[in-house]
From Swiss-Prot:
Chief localisation class: cytoplasm
GO cellular component: cytosol
Species for this entry: Enterobacter sp. (strain 638)
Alphabetical GO biological process terms: post-transcriptional regulation of gene expression
Gene Ontology terms, MF aspect: RNA strand annealing activity; RNA strand-exchange activity
Keyword terms, alphabetized: Chaperone, Cytoplasm, RNA-binding
Keyword RNA-binding part of the UniProt annotation: yes
UniProt region (Disordered), positions on chain: 105-179
The gene coding this protein: proQ
Protein name: RNA chaperone ProQ
Start-end of Basic and acidic residues biased regions: 144-159
Amino acid sequence: MENQPKLNSSKEVIAFLAERFPQCFSAEGEARPLKIGIFQDLVARVEGEMSLSKTQLRSALRLYTSSWRYLYGIKLGATRVDLDGNPCGELDEQHVEHARKQLEEAKARVQAQRAEQQAKKREAAAANGEEAPRRERKPRPAPRRNENSERKPRAEKPAAKAQPAPREEQRHTPVSDITALSVGQSLKVKAGNNAMDATVLEITKDGVRVQLTSGMSMIVRAEHLVF
């Protein structure tokens, strides 16, 4: 027991649980809903293995059940499982609604953080541009004229080219009816003052599931969608 390797992070504990109980936990992909009270089952089965403590198990379980992939699996009709994968009852509507709100709040936090980071980058770039010292240009010495040479007439300066009219800021059309959308359709998702390209994956009663160019998918309400 003394020579057993120690798991130092919740992610390592989750990977261990996925290997130890593959019919219950998964290290990637959509996760299955867990039995209510599964923490006590875990304590009885694995406490002491890999030098695991109750605190480590509780932290790993909290991280696992708050992940997006776990919350995606909380759907009406889905069945909870125990450590061995045996069914332990269907999810009720209250738990499904709670998971949906958790997922929406988590996505909103991520979008807000990204918008804040982009705003800080723009502010930093603007500040660096204003504070950068300008180099003074030294005047060039005038060329010496040969007294015997004739003065050449100055060439007329070409007329200044007309500056092109500034491009009008692109305006986006808000999506008023999500039922008019179709799977595979391209649109944009508003995040702060920015609009990110996305593709429609699914139209649900809660909104539209889209996939960003980064590969991340999320459910977005109609007021955050534009063309």
